Amino acid sequence: MAEFKYDIVKTFGTVSENDNGWVKEVNLVSWNEREPVYDIRVWQENHEKLGKGITLTEVELKNLKNLLNTMDI
């Protein structure tokens, strides 16, 4: 398995937390020393382990925000 690096540049907040202490967060993350992207992902509390997630560019995040604003929720 290939090794990768990540740096959480900014944490925006927690979406949810499960009973095992894993949290779903919205962060700005630099993967492998690249330009930071917006990231929604499940993390272990200390950020040493991570689960599946999604990364979004600024344009994609703005599009998602616009889409969510049109939803009747």
Give the role of each language-model region.
Residues 1-73:
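Positively charged, low-complexity terminal tracts
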